């Protein structure tokens, strides 16, 4: 269900005076919510003039799987670009030695207790734009589980030339329900990735999702999170008739998107029992040279850990 679109882009830092100095990756990292201009406040007010009706909103919820299946029927594997950036942003995804699973950086073998294969679950795997770049880049330390609400997306993952059930398993799943426990056992995962997926879920169901993930993950395991941030350009551009609720919208194709505040993400994970290791807004200026477009993007990025068992 991932929703970061495919386009030729070049990222530059956001030089807005209100924000701190950009990081060396060209991003601006901050815990402050964007300050709206008068024009931007007017855009949000316009959205309220015609809201999605409660009947329409309920219908969208019931038909969420259908809309994502239709999305992948239209777009197949062409819509999203491969996420080779994830290992740059989340070093936890890196293998100790990409060439030899179970080997440390100096070439020595880990002991038997340490040599157990790590397990990773990508929630909202789409067509595999995170997991297959990991494999292509040599990070094969994991047994990978990959799930998506859309059975069509999962079928596209299974058809990929790198799909191999010796070290991965893709399956359809509604992560808002206990359905996932039919495939993945409790306390079995080292890492769970949530990359542009929670935004596609009704905000009222998010606590249940994070609670399920807490049950799945091992003590000391990690959740890696990235999603749309409050007042992102895409949120401001919605017209009247697309707003379902506060910061929650429907696109033309029937898929939905929520825009997160940094503090609500932290609260969501803390209430489920996670420790917040990192959580902040990422302000990025995205330039589409082909279309001569220069737009500011806002994401929330975080790392959340299930507390380790006391020794």
Predicted regions located by residue number:
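A short SAM/SAH-binding and catalytic strip from SAM-dependent methyltransferases
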Residues: 189-205
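A short acidic, Gly/Pro-enriched loop at the edge of an enzyme's catalytic core
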Residues: 180-192
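Core SAM-dependent methyltransferase catalytic element
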Residues: 274, 285-311
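Conserved alpha-helix/loop element of class I SAM-dependent methyltransferases that forms part
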Residues: 79-117, 133
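Class I SAM-dependent methyltransferase SAM/SAH-binding core
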Residues: 114-181
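N-terminal auxiliary segments of SAM/dcSAM-dependent transferases
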Residues: 2-70
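A short glycine-rich, Lys/Arg-flanked "PGG" loop and its adjoining helix->strand segment in the class I
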Residues: 207-222
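C-terminal alpha-helical "lid/dimerization" subdomain adjacent to the S-adenosyl-L-methionine
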Residues: 229-291
């Amino acid at each position: 269900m991932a929703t970061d679109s495919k386009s030729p882009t070049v990222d530059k830092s956001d030089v807005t005076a209100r924000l701190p100095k950009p990081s060396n990756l060209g991003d601006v990292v901050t815990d402050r919510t964007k300050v709206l201009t008068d024009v931007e406040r007017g855009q949000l007010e316009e959205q309220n003039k015609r809201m999605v009706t409660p009947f329409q909103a309920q219908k969208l919820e019931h038909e969420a799987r259908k809309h994502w299946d239709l999305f992948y029927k239209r777009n197949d594997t062409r819509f999203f670009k491969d996420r080779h950036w994830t290992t740059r942003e989340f070093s936890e995804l890196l293998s100790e030695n990409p060439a030899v699973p179970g080997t440390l950086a100096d070439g020595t073998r880990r002991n038997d207790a340490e040599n157990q294969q790590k397990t990773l679950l990508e929630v909202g795997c789409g067509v595999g734009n995170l997991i297959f770049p990991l494999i292509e880049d040599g990070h094969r330390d994991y047994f990978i589980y990959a799930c998506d609400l859309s059975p069509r997306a999962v079928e596209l993952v299974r058809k990929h030339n790198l799909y191999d059930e010796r070290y991965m398993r893709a399956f359809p799943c509604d992560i808002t329900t206990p359905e996932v426990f039919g495939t993945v056992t409790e306390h079995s995962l080292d890492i769970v990735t949530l990359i542009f997926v929670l935004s596609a879920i009704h905000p009222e169901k998010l606590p249940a999702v994070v609670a399920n993930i807490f049950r799945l993950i091992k003590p000391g395991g990690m959740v890696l999170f990235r999603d749309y941030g409050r007042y992102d350009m895409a949120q401001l551009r919605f017209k009247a008739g697309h707003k379902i609720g506060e910061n929650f919208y429907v696109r033309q194709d029937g898929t939905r998107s929520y825009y997160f505040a940094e503090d609500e993400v932290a609260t969501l994970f803390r209430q489920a029992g996670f420790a917040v290791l990192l959580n902040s807004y990422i302000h990025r200026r995205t330039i589409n040279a082909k279309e001569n477009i220069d737009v500011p993007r806002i994401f929330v990025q975080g790392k959340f850990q299930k507390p380790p068992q006391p020794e």
